[in-house]
Amino acid sequence: MKDVRELLKVNEEKLPRIYCDMDQVLCALLRTANQITGQDFSKMNKDTRWKIISNVKGFWENLPWMPGAKRLYQRIAKYDPYILSAYPEKDVNARGGKVKWVLNNTRIPKSRILVVKRAEKQRYATHNGEFSVLIDDYIKNIKEWENKGGVGIHHTDVSRTLKELSNLGYK
């Protein structure tokens, strides 16, 4: 991770925009999908796994929170974060369901919920010439984000992410 304190003399009144991923950061996609399919979802054939999930009514909007994720959300909520989540193209319910999840579980307005193709996430790395921060569990997204001038926090657990946010000035 870039040392943001060097890039920006952190002004706590004007911190960079935060984008937060959903799946495996805020909501427990894999645990729920593993329970529904009865197998390791990540190792299943993509067509097969998304066909199963797309047939589960309310799958996306009913995902449970990840352990500790409410603490993370409470920290970032005061900085008017955006949700930046990728949708699987093979599940027609994913985009709408993800938006419903955010609206039902957070106070983030619809105008700050971005559900895009995975490769499009990097387009948000900067805003008005300034870098933005991405919290994401997928290292490829973090690397692409940083290559486009943003600062990435590779989310592996809540405590680590909260520490990195503190180091960036998000208290």
How does the language model describe each region?
Residues 44, 54-83, 91-96:
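Short, acidic loop-to-helix structural element flanking the phosphoryl-transfer center
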